[in-house]
């Protein structure tokens, strides 16, 4: 579960390395975000030749959480870190590559492009 002030790893080649959640989108009282949810992030650490810079604010989709996700068959998938993929204003990924696995829950949302770019879908 991701909330405000959560530090996140950027899992694409947009140039961001670390980001911080500044808002969970989807309602004024919404506190937590799970896999597949869109959040607003601020870039805290960036690569020198990347497309994004430190201090920039972007939308992002959560692709991995340490809290995990429960499937309808009873299984639970957890990851070692909390990771995001940065999005532009049209909710398309900024980067052209995705690092690390993503879950099938992104397929049901509008993020098929991220699923197709990912090296592994769990």
UniProtKB/Swiss-Prot annotation:
InterPro entries, per the entry: Ribosomal_uL14, Ribosomal_uL14_bac-type, Ribosomal_uL14_CS, Ribosomal_uL14_sf
Gene Ontology terms describing biological process: translation
Entry keywords, A to Z: Ribonucleoprotein, Ribosomal protein, RNA-binding, rRNA-binding
Signal peptide stretch: none
Gene3D superfamilies xrefs: Ribosomal protein L14
Pfam families hit by this protein: Ribosomal_L14 (PF00238)
Statement: the UniProt record of this protein carries the keyword Ribonucleoprotein: yes
Gene Ontology terms, MF aspect: large ribosomal subunit rRNA binding; structural constituent of ribosome
GO cellular component: cytosolic large ribosomal subunit
SMART domains: Ribosomal_L14 (SM01374)
Description of how the protein assembles with itself and partners: Part of the 50S ribosomal subunit. Forms a cluster with proteins L3 and L19. In the 70S ribosome, L14 and L19 interact and together make contacts with the 16S rRNA in bridges B5 and B8.
Known function: Binds to 23S rRNA. Forms part of two intersubunit bridges in the 70S ribosome.
Entry similarity comment: Belongs to the universal ribosomal protein uL14 family.
Name of the molecule in the record: Large ribosomal subunit protein uL14
Species assigned in the record: Ruthia magnifica subsp. Calyptogena magnifica
Name of the gene: rplN
């Amino acid at each position: 579960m991701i909330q405000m002030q959560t530090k996140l790893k950027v899992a694409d080649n947009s140039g961001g390395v670390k980001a911080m959640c500044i808002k969970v989108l989807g309602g004024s009282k919404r506190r937590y975000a799970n896999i597949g949810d869109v959040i607003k992030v601020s870039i805290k650490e960036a690569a020198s030749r990347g497309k994004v810079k430190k201090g920039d604010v972007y939308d992002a989709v959560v692709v991995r959480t340490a809290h995990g996700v429960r499937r309808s068959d009873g299984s639970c998938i957890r990851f070692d870190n909390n990771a995001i993929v940065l999005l532009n204003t049209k909710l398309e990924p900024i980067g052209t590559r995705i690092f690390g696995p993503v879950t099938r829950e992104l397929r049901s949302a509008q993020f098929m492009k991220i699923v197709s770019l990912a090296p592994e879908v769990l």
